[in-house]
Design a protein with these regions (language model features):
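Short, acidic, Ser/Thr-enriched surface-loop or helix-capping motifs
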Residues: 119-120, 202
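Non-catalytic regulatory/interaction regions at protein termini and inter-domain linkers
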Residues: 1-21, 36, 52
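Extracytoplasmic/periplasmic ligand-binding sensor regions of membrane-associated signaling proteins
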Residues: 110, 121, 125-190, 194-197
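Juxtamembrane extracytoplasmic/periplasmic/luminal helical "stalk" adjacent to the first N-terminal
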Residues: 20-97, 108-114
Length: 276
């Protein structure tokens, strides 16, 4: 009897232990489910926060490029207007008065305005500034029937912009702008994040402004294929095709940090809009 009672007691202990273990498993399962639910909720909140942050960043980038586009258009329009009004005044003056007028303008608008060159029938009749004439036209964009905007090469340097005006009386007026001086003064100080920067291209994809001098004047695709052989530019090329259509948009694409050693690959976000 004693043996049987011990057996019963052991069975009760075993059952009691099993019940306790069952409760433990149930509690553990419940806690695991609760933690999993919290993780799912937390992950969902984090994704929404991240997506919201990305959307805000894209909106800010688009506002920045649209603002810069407007500022660049105003700058070009002001220089173009100055050329027309200065010519209207200067072509009635004598030679010395004309030189003084243009020299004063170049000095007051330096270092961005570097030179003014006036020619008639291909012959230079006036120069103000450094007297360095362009040797090669790398890009040309028409503003109107008499005015165009160019990227030109002087010596071995390709960071010069030029407004070229054809007068009604047969003269041509070329205003040479130091593009890097303009970039450093107006564009580089703008905050676009830790690694962001602004770039200006023409309608054919030729780089007109870039934080790196060696990239001025290159084709944004073919030029980089030569500078960085072996890079996959498919995603970048697709985005450039959309830019050439004159669209205003924000794209995510795969590219490279061209300004960093070795140009490491990276997922990028680019906001773009027509500049003129």
């Amino acid at each position: 009897m004693e043996k049987n009672e011990n057996c019963k007691e052991n069975r009760f202990l075993s059952m009691d232990s099993l019940k306790k273990n069952s409760r433990f498993y149930l509690v553990a399962a419940f806690l695991a489910a609760a933690i999993l639910a919290l993780l799912c909720v937390g992950n969902g909140i984090w994704k929404e926060y991240r997506n919201s942050a990305v959307r805000n960043q894209k909106d800010q980038m688009l506002l920045a490029v649209e603002s810069l586009s407007g500022r660049l258009e105003e700058t070009i329009s002001e220089y173009a207007s100055d050329i027309r009004s200065m010519w209207s005044c200067s072509h009635t003056l004598n030679e010395q008065e004309r030189e003084t007028l243009w020299d004063t303008y170049v000095k007051e608008h330096g270092p961005v305005v570097q030179d003014v060159i006036i020619k008639k029938k291909g012959e230079t009749i006036l120069t103000s500034g450094t007297d360095n004439e362009p040797e090669e036209i790398l890009s040309e964009s028409k503003i109107d029937d008499q005015m165009c905007f160019r990227l030109v090469k002087i010596g071995n340097e390709s960071h010069y912009l030029m407004l070229h005006y054809e007068t009604d009386t047969g003269e041509t007026i070329s205003m040479i702008l130091n593009g890097m001086a303009y970039y450093n003064k107006t564009i580089r100080p703008l905050n676009v994040g830790t690694n962001g920067y602004f770039i200006l291209k023409d309608h054919n994809g030729i780089v007109l402004m870039h934080p790196q001098l060696e990239q001025w004047g290159i084709d944004v695709i073919n030029g980089r294929e030569k500078m960085f052989p072996g890079k996959n530019l498919t995603s970048l090329s697709n985005m450039i095709d959309r830019q050439k259509q004159g669209l205003t948009a924000v794209d995510e694409y795969y590219s490279y940090w061209w300004t960093k050693p070795g140009a490491p690959g990276v997922e990028k976000v680019s906001a773009y809009t027509p500049a003129y």
